[in-house]
Amino acid sequence: MSSTEATVFDVIVIGGGHAGCEAASAAARAGARTALVTHRFDTIGVMSCNPAIGGLGKGHLVREIDALDGLMGRVADEAGIQFRLLNRRKGPAVRGPRTQADRKLYRLAMQKMIAAQDNLFVVEGGAHDLREEHGRITGVVLSDGRTLSCGAVVLTTGTFLNGLIHIGEKKIPAGRMGEKPALGLSERLTSFGFALGRLKTGTPPRLDGRTIDWQSLDMQSADEEPVPFSLMTDRITIPQIDCGITRTTPETHAVIRANLHRSAMYSGSIEGIGPRYCPSVEDKIVKFGDRDGHQIFLEPEGLDDDTVYPNGISTSLPEDVQLDILKTIPGLETAAMLQPGYAIEYDFIDPRELKRSLETRKVTGLFLAGQINGTTGYEEAGAQGLLAGINAARRASGGDPVIIQRTEAYIGVMVDDLTSRGVSEPYRMFTSRAEFRLSLRADNADQRLTPLADKLGILGHARKERFEARETALDEARSLTQSLTITPNLASRYDLRLNQDGVRRSAYDLLSYPEIDLDRLKSIWPELGAVDPATREALEIEAQYAVYMDRQKSDIAVMEREEQLLIPAGLDIDGISGLSNELKHKLKQRRPETIAEAQRVDGMTPAALALLIAQIKKFGYRQRAASELSEGQGAA
C-alpha cells in the first residue's frame, strides 16, 4: 500500500532493503497492521552492491524464502538476466541457483509487490529513535518528530547504522553512496545495553560498458534452460545476456602494492572486519601474492543500462589509483569509471544478544535482521527479515514465537549459528555449514517449509493450490514407480545390469542406480512417459537420496531430542559444581535455551555438558517436589 498518515501499527519495520522488505511483507501476511519506514519509496529494493541473487548456499536461502511465500525468489525471476545453476555437475544437495539481475527491474518488481501487499503501509521518513517502556518496545520516533506506536519493531538498518564510506583518505558519512546514514539509533541501542561492534564491506568501481573492449574477453553465457527460483514462476521470459571474464595482471599487483599505504584498509582508517569470502583486491594481493592473476567477472547491471559491475576488484584505494589499476587489466585499459569503488564501515550488534526468534534478549518486541546481526549478503538478510517479520507479528498479537531448527532449513542453520556462536567477521551462508545438507536441498525447500507457511497463515491461496498440485503429482508418480517391478533376469534384456539375486526391484528402486532415469525406464514401462518434467526431476532426486535420507533421519532424530531438552530460565548456573568460571560466565551471558544451543557455546566440553544436564534434572526434581508439597498442603 502507499504511504499513510496513520500512527498506530502492530509492527514497524525500519529499512526498505532486502531484510526490511521480507520482514514487512511477512508481518503483513501474518495479519499484522505493518508500517515500513524508509527514507524514500523509490529506494525500496535497491541492490546496494552486486547485481546478483543466489549462488552456493545463498540459492538455498532464496528457495526457502520462496517456500515461505516470501518475495525475493519471485522478484529475482522477474529481473534475472543471466540464470546459471552452479555446481550443476555435482549432486543436487550442493547445486546453487543464481542469477544476475537488472537493478532497475529488481527494484521496480520489489516496489510493486510491497505496494500490492494488504496490511502494509509505507511511511517515508528517517527513523531517529526508539520508544521503550519497562523493557518493552512501544514505538518509533521519526526524524521529522512524528511518533509511531506499535507492539513490535524490526530493525533492518543494513550498512546505514553509523555508516562511513572510505575512498583512500576520504571519509563520507553515508549508508551507501549518496544516502545519509542512520545516526541516532546507535545511541539508543547503546542505552539499551547493547555492545556495538564495527564491520566492513566493500564494492568495486562501476564502469561504462561502452568503453570496455569486449572483443578481447572470454564470455560466459546463461544456461540454455534457465531454472527459476520460485515455484510460482512457470518460465523465465526476460532476455538473457553474457558476462565478460578477465583477470588482474602482475602490473595490476605492482600498482596495488605501491599504493597500499593509501588504501583505507591498510592505512589504519578502517576498524571494522571485512568478509573473508569476499575480500578486497588489496587483500587478495597481500594474502595471495604468489598468484599471477585473480579472476574478474564483468557483469552488466541491466538490459538498458551501460553500467558494468566488475566482480572481483572491490577496493578502498583512492580514485586515481583505481584508474591506474583499470589500465593494467585486459579489456579495461580504456574503461571509464562511472563511480569509484569504496569500503563502508557500519555498526552491528553481537547476534548472541538475540533469541532464535531474532527478538533481542534485552528489549521485548525489538527484532533485528540483516547486516545489523553481522551477516553479509542479500539472501542472508532476506531470510532473517522473513523470520523476524513473522515473529514480530506474533509478538504483537501475543502468539508464541516460531523457531526454525537447523535440521529443517538453512534459515535455521544460519540463525542458530548467529545466536549461539556469534560472528568475528561478516557471516555468509555455505552448504558446508549444514550438517544435514542432503535433507536441506534447494529442490525440496517447498516440501520442507510450505506446510509451515500454511500453518502460520502466511501462505497465499495461489501458492497453496500450486504446491498441493505439485505434491499430488509427485505422490502419484512415486506410487506408480513403486508399483512397477522387474526381475534381474528380465532387466538384463533391457541392458540394465543388476545383481542376479532373484529379487524383484521397483522402478523407484532402479532410479537410485547411477545413470538410470525415467527416460531409460520408459522402454520397459511406457506409462512413465506421462510424468511431467518437473515431477520427473523431483522424483529422480528423491529416489537417488532415499537410502541416505533414511540414515540422516535417524541422525536428525537424535539432534531433535537434544533440541527438546530445555534449560529452565531459573536454573542456578553458579550452583553447578565442577563447571569452570569461564563457562559459567558464558552460559549466563548467552543464556542458551536448549542443550543443543549450550553444546555450541565456545569452550563447552562433553564433561561440562554432562554437569549441565545433571543440574537440569536436579532442578526438575526440586520443581516437582515443591509442586507435590504445595498440592499436599492445599489438600490438607
Curated annotation (Swiss-Prot):
InterPro entries named in the record: FAD/NAD-bd_sf, GIDA_C_N, MnmG, MnmG-rel, MnmG-rel_CS, MnmG_C, MnmG_C_subdom, MnmG_C_subdom_sf
Annotated keywords: Cytoplasm, FAD, Flavoprotein, NAD, tRNA processing
Highest taxon listed in the record's lineage: Bacteria
Swiss-Prot/TrEMBL cofactor(s): FAD
Positions contributing to NAD(+) binding: 274-288
Any one GO MF annotation of this record: flavin adenine dinucleotide binding
Residues spanning the signal sequence: none
UniProt subcellular location: Cytoplasm
GO annotation terms (biological process): tRNA methylation; tRNA wobble uridine modification
PANTHER family per UniProt: GLUCOSE INHIBITED DIVISION PROTEIN A, PROTEIN MTO1 HOMOLOG, MITOCHONDRIAL
Similarity comment: family membership: Belongs to the MnmG family.
Complex and partners: Homodimer. Heterotetramer of two MnmE and two MnmG subunits.
Protein name: tRNA uridine 5-carboxymethylaminomethyl modification enzyme MnmG
Species for this entry: Brucella anthropi (strain ATCC 49188 / DSM 6882 / CCUG 24695 / JCM 21032 / LMG 3331 / NBRC 15819 / NCTC 12168 / Alc 37) (Ochrobactrum anthropi)
